[in-house]
Amino acid sequence: MNDLFLTNYTDETFLSRLKQCFKRCVSFSLSVSFIKKAGLILFEREMEEALKRGVKGRIITSTYQNFTDIESLRTFNEWQRKYSNFECHLDHVCFGDNGYHSKGYLFEYDDSLEIIVGSTNITRFALKKNIEWNISLVSKESIDSYNGAMNNFEFLWERTFDLNEDRIKQYSILLDYAIEKWDMDYVNPMSQRVVPNSMQRKALKELRRYRDTGVSRALI
């Protein structure tokens, strides 16, 4: 069994490894909580080339924290129409209060198996810049870690929704009304810091004074 530690700064990066996996695999199963088009596009070509070769591909992603974007889901839905060997499932509060937060990449090759697990979601920052840790295990024989992950993948697959146009529309409406919507991949690092005006500064000062005296509620 071979093992690798993968980051954005190791000799072989997580992204470069992922691209090689798609070039060699005969099947892949991905369970990734957060997927952004700006991240997906970094290896989209390799992934679609695998599907064109007839590789069986499955992905589970999630609406958890409203992070996955509509563009990625539309890409996956288009692939489902184009390739009978590709399927995508969507977690939308399928597990109640248990947030869907996995990052697992399973690949089957002609002569071996590979599992990559760690912290990396499919976002541009996660794949190019962030400090991320991932472990890859490759074995020519069946190993407990791969089997356990695949069993859990099947469990999750049976309890999540088929991705379709109606679910994408429902999620799009949810995003339009969402209170929390933050997209690191598109944050402008040069954007100006928000500074309170004079009236807001006075209100914040009064709130601090109330907190200091033990008051927990106030009207502004």
Regions found by a protein language model. Give the residues of each.
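Walker A/P-loop
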Residues: 212-220
